[in-house]
Amino acid sequence: MGETALLVLEGPWWTPAHKPKRPSVLPFLEGLEKYKGNFNIYYSNFYEKQGFQRALEDDLANAREDRLFLYIAAHGGSRMVGALEAEEGKSITGGMRLTTLLKGVRRVARTANIEGVLLGSCTIGSNRADMLATLKTSPIAWIFGYACEIDWIPSTLIDISVLEHAMALKKEDLRSRTKIVGAFTSALRRFSGEYPICKEENRTVPLKHAISLSIKPRKAGAHPEDRTRALLDELGWS
């Protein structure tokens, strides 16, 4: 067993009527797991806040690895995560508030070694103050997310690249803002900053305006910062 684990909590993306094969991020992650061979996946589904918290606690109870990374993959909108409606507008799951989700993450992170959190949800990354508050009151070193309504396939591929490089950081690298930003630079350099990853109200948003990275190095006296601009500068996307 490797020393690294990826905890994956995935909400429903589509109804069976809309996409009967029920697409999931799991096969993409399993491909990375088989390719790298140095981490293990703990996967759960959730439909509402109680299910989210139970899934997270169960995964942590079963994980024996020293280094943990959390990937939350679900619908996002404004300040809600995991909501899903049927085509006729009826709510299948109401999801949960972002503040509720982050409160749960902070609580478990104080007793589990969660190094980083990837929020694979539309628009949630725009709530930078919430990300910084989460880092301030937890040992989590970084949070990455998206600030607009992202396309599913492209964002999933970006998530895979981000996880590959972020999980490759050494423990001592987490003391350095430069090295953390460097890992995300390497992950995103595979893509074009001009790629129109978001579609909103008759306009498109390029990848360079869609990402959000908050960091708090693991060292005494460190404070959380929004390092999105530094990341864009390193990529040459600013």
Task: Please annotate each region the language model reported.
Residues 80-83, 128:
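Active-site-adjacent loop/helix micro-motif of nuclease/hydrolase catalytic cores
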Residues 88-156:
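Catalytic cores of nucleophile-dependent amide-cleaving enzymes
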Residues 1-69, 75-76, 83-95, 112-114, ...:
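A domain-level signal for caspase-like cysteine endopeptidase catalytic cores
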Residues 47-53, 150-153, 205-206:
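A short acidic, often aromatic-flanked loop/helix-cap motif at beta-alpha or helix-coil junctions
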Residues 28-36, 56-63, 101-109, 135, ...:
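Hydrophobic, Leu/Ile/Phe/Ala-enriched alpha-helical segments that form helix-helix packing faces
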Residues 156-169:
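Short, small-residue alpha-helix embedded
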Residues 98-101, 170-238:
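Caspase-like cysteine protease fold
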Residues 75-78, 124-126:
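A short acidic, glycine/proline-enriched capping/turn motif at secondary-structure boundaries
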